[in-house]
């Protein structure tokens, strides 16, 4: 689990940095016309990099930082749906699909499993730390 989160974190940091500094190479590689305003791509790079930091935080303290992983899961899932829609409409070339797969889609199943495991561990920790008189809550 921690190794996967470290890999995802490092990948996101590098991907974010490349979106900020080397965006022109990315456009060339994908065969997409570079827009006049680059700011949205660079802001997205900042967010991708911040998720990289977040995945490293989850790896360092999984239960405490588990909600960062939930945000990352939804971010990867929703951005994958939108990107596939753009490929389907022809706005992005089909060559973008392998990039999307390696950047986002491949992480969805393990992130989901890790999220479930961490939620169960957090619930167990909560039960252990709860005083006996508060074992059941009624609204």
Predicted segments with their positions:
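Membrane-helix boundary elements
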Residues: 1-4, 12-39
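Core segments of alpha-helical transmembrane spans in multipass integral membrane proteins
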Residues: 10-18, 36-59, 71-81
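Juxtamembrane helix-break-helix junctions at the cytosolic face
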Residues: 26, 53-67, 87-88
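Non-cytosolic membrane-interface motifs at loop->transmembrane helix junctions
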Residues: 30-39, 67-71, 93-103
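Hydrophobic alpha-helical segments of small multi-pass membrane proteins
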Residues: 69-83, 100-111
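Membrane-helix boundary connector in multi-pass membrane proteins
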Residues: 81-99, 117
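Membrane-water interface at the C-terminal end of transmembrane alpha helices
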Residues: 105-126
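Short, highly charged, low-complexity non-transmembrane loops/tails of multi-pass membrane proteins
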Residues: 124-139
């Amino acid at each position: 689990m921690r190794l996967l989160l470290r890999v995802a974190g490092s990948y996101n940091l590098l991907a974010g940095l490349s979106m900020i500094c080397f965006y022109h190479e990315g456009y060339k590689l994908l065969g997409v016309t570079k827009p006049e305003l680059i700011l949205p791509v660079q802001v997205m790079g900042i967010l991708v990099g911040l998720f990289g930091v977040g995945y490293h935080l989850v790896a360092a303290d999984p239960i405490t930082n588990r909600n960062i992983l939930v945000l990352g899961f939804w971010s990867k899932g929703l951005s994958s749906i939108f990107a596939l829609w753009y490929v389907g409409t022809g706005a992005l070339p089909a060559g973008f699909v392998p990039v999307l797969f390696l950047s986002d889609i491949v992480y969805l199943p393990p992130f989901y499993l890790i999220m479930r495991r961490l939620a169960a561990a957090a619930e167990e920790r909560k039960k252990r730390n709860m005083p006996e008189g508060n074992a059941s809550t009624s609204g």
